[in-house]
């Protein structure tokens, strides 16, 4: 399957659908898409990885690099739809502890809503 990324928006959250294989060949394109979102002020991101078939070390590095960029901009990156192979890679590398995972997009979107509605402490 060819690599592709598409972006949708729901309120102040960008939903990024990633399909195919995320390897060294595709990681630059993925990075540019996330950086464009950040440059345009979209700092809350949900990665829908339902269609991601494979992830190599370059793809893992790109996920981490993009996550760090989002956090530095004051945003959050969450994931949904981990295929078993991708989930196993994230567990083996301990990255499942870094990326908040949700069972579906609705749950991930609700988690952003909960953050927006949380009381501000003085």
Indicate residue ranges for each PLM-predicted region:
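Conserved beta-strand core positions
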Residues: 3, 14, 45, 75-78, ...
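Active-site donor-binding loop signature of nucleotide-sugar glycosyltransferases
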Residues: 18-20, 104
């Amino acid at each position: 399957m060819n690599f592709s990324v598409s972006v949708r928006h729901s309120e102040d959250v960008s939903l990024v659908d990633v399909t195919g294989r995320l390897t060294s060949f595709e990681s630059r394109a993925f990075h540019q898409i996330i950086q464009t979102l950040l440059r345009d002020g979209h700092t809350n991101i949900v990665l829908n990885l339902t269609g991601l078939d494979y992830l190599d070390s370059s793809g893992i590095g790109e996920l981490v690099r993009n996550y760090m960029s989002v956090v530095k901009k004051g945003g959050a990156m969450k994931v949904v739809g981990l295929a078993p192979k991708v989930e196993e890679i994230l567990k083996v590398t301990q990255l499942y502890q870094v990326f908040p995972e949700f069972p579906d997009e609705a749950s991930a979107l609700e988690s952003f809503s909960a953050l927006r509605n949380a009381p501000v402490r003085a």
